[in-house]
């Protein structure tokens, strides 16, 4: 096939989630060099390196002629590149190659869940515009969560999530659900106020969270809306189904236990102050402002059914 791009850059972390990173890079490179006339691989050694590279592209007026960016990693790593692209107004399409435990947004893009097949999928992909969440000053592709999601992440101790993958995460979930910690919330959503007690709040752009699919067909990461979910304290069995990757659920099964509020801007206050999980990274505390930025980024997307492992 003829290359579609002049110069592509692939970013990766040494600890990207692939067991044998250099073998994985070789497989990915075979595919991406078919897409790009010139192809550069860039190791990110420290947090913030990817954003600095994006800043350099802007500062140098993109003198290297880069016209596509790729990222190998999980959702948190992907967000590093998304933040760099948006903060420095690069206006470049991004190709995502899964390299973490769940890679939720890669599923939204109809990509395979493994790096090698996903890089082959990108040969069939085309850029499509997607919304992006903004949580305080951070851009986020997929979700922000408060309560049980943070408890769950903190229960996955040390390296266990990387070593044992989904099994470790699910076992942690079962532990978390047996000991939920309720909190009080005040949500100011587009001029309306909601108050109450819950064990979990979820703010979602994508349709996959922690490997499971939110069973709401009309959800779309390109509709200009943020999806706010307030979980009933008595819906522990429902939460277990969602976290345990049960794909057969329908919204009618859970709508009595979860309030869904389409929104654009949300101000979140909790009592006591709570940690906030942003695509698997716990970096903020309430209160926080969350908004949706419509059509903010171009991501390489495959038509449904074309992915190698579908």
Walk through the language-model features, giving the residues of each:
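Glycine-rich phosphate/pyrophosphate-binding beta-alpha loops
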Residues: 145, 202-215, 282
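Glycine-rich beta-strand-to-loop/alpha-helix junction loops that act as flexible
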Residues: 14, 72-74, 99
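Short Gly/Thr/Asp-enriched flexible loops that form oxyanion-binding sites at enzyme active sites
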Residues: 76-92
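Catalytic core of DAGKc-family lipid kinases
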Residues: 35, 87-199
């Amino acid at each position: 096939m003829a290359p579609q791009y002049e110069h592509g850059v692939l970013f990766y972390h040494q600890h990207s989630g692939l067991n044998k990173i250099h073998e994985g890079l070789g497989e990915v490179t075979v595919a991406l060099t078919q897409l790009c006339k010139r192809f550069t691989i860039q190791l990110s050694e420290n947090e913030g390196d990817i954003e600095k590279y994006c800043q350099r592209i802007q500062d140098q007026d993109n003198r290297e002629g880069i016209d596509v960016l790729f990222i190998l990693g999980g959702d948190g790593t992907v967000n590093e590149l998304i933040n760099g692209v948006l903060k420095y107004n690069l206006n470049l399409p991004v190709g995502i190659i899964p390299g973490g435990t769940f890679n939720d947004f890669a599923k939204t893009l109809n990509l395979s869940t493994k790096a090698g097949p996903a890089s082959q999928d990108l040969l069939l992909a085309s850029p499509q515009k997607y919304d992006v969440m903004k949580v305080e000053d951070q851009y986020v592709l997929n979700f922000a969560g408060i309560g049980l999601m943070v408890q769950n992440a903190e229960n996955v101790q040390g390296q266990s999530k990387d070593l044992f993958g989904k099994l470790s995460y699910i076992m942690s979930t079962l532990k978390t659900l047996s000991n939920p910690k309720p909190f009080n919330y005040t949500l100011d959503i587009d001029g309306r106020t909601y108050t109450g007690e819950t064990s979990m709040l979820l703010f979602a752009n994508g349709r996959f969270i922690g490997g499971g699919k939110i069973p709401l067909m009309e959800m779309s990461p390109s509709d200009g809306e943020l999806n706010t979910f307030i979980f009933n304290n008595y819906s522990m069995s429902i939460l277990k189904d969602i976290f345990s990757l049960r794909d057969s659920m329908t919204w009618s099964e859970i709508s009595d236990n979860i309030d869904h509020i389409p929104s654009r801007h949300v101000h979140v206050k909790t009592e006591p102050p709570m940690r906030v999980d942003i695509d698997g990274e716990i970096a903020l505390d309430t209160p926080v402002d969350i908004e949706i930025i419509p059509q903010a980024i171009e991501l390489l997307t495959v038509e449904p059914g074309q992915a190698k492992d579908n």
